[in-house]
Amino acid sequence: MSTNLEVGIVGLPNVGKSTLFNAITKAGAEAANYPFCTIEPNVGVVDVPDKRLDVLSDMFKSKKIVPAAMRFVDIAGLVKGESKGEGLGNKFLSHIREVDAVAEVVRCFEDGNITHVEGSIDPLRDIDIINTELCLADMETVEKRQERLVKLAKTGDKKVKLEQAVMEKVMAGLSDGVPARRLGLTEEEQEFLGELHLLTMKPVLYITNVAEGEVADPSGNEHVQAVKKYAAEENAEVIVVSAKMESEVAELPEEEAKEYLEMAGLEETGLDRLIKAGFKLLGLMTFLTAGEMESRAWTIKLNTKAPQAAGKIHTDFERGFIRAEIVSFDDLVACGSKAAAREKGLVRLEGKDYVMQDGDVVEFRFNV
């Protein structure tokens, strides 16, 4: 995974996807009321909000702050028959293969002025259409691999036999419209799929787009409740946003935006909730480095060991890793300075087997 986490935003036409994306990146992608106005994916890079960086920057008198980043890719509106080239075809599907996770925007608001491509509001049907298209595209990928395996099987390699069995299992699921991630595959089975970059193996989060008044309390919105129930079956994340409201907030100065959110009964923007959900979905966390030059956040997978975390900064750090000098952010703040934390014995030296924790403030020692 690159340093920047990449999330592809997909949805049927006119569900509020581009409006939401514009709000996310203030990128001004053409949010228009007709299908296919975004064929080339628009990419927006946003900072991952982290108040700890401000605290570290003050403490270490850092010249700059470098937050972690998340890339959002607005992938063109999808329609039925996509994988057969009826809508935007394979161009759309190749864009989505490159992302770490997929965020599906589904419409859960009524508005007579905005047409729905399927004629009525039904988010579960919309999810089903998207899943069907992604399953069909994956079937083509698996089929090509199966053809290749037939040739390889002639060598009598046992591993090929195992892989063939996995492909059959996945193909059967996809044929029934079951995404590969819902097939309960073992880790060993998943390894065979690694290089195929199957679309339906990617973790998914659902963004339910509601009317402005329902964001703080969507309990009365039956569409949202239906999506939540569906998502629970695959441990997927669901976030509730109003794309219209997000685009309004995005235009405001920070203080006014805060007041606007408070009036709506919200503590944070939909974007912040989306980023948190993305982190949770992909099992990510943050460690921090701080000094006079900069205070910076680094994104790693949960359970990453110290040398691999060091490698995020520079490959030399991993190669020549000696030790990591670590203090937890909370301990550091409680003590007021690194020197005070050291006096209290809260600054630790950790070796190559240390598993990083969220909020570790680190200085790596290495020798190349």
Language model: regions and residue ranges:
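Short capping/connector residues at structural and topological boundaries
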Residues: 36, 41-44, 51-53, 58-65, ...
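Amphipathic alpha-helical transducer elements in NTP-driven molecular machines
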Residues: 36, 50-53, 66-72, 86-100, ...
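Glycine-rich, flexible loop/turn motifs
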Residues: 27-35, 42-44, 52-55, 84, ...
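Short, flexible surface segments
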Residues: 98, 357-358
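Conserved Switch II/interswitch segment of TRAFAC-class P-loop GTPases
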Residues: 44-49, 76-86, 97-159, 173-186, ...
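Conserved G1/Walker A P-loop phosphate-binding module
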Residues: 1-115, 143-144
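C-terminal-of-GTPase-core extension/linker across diverse P-loop GTPases
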Residues: 1-10, 15, 21, 148-355, ...
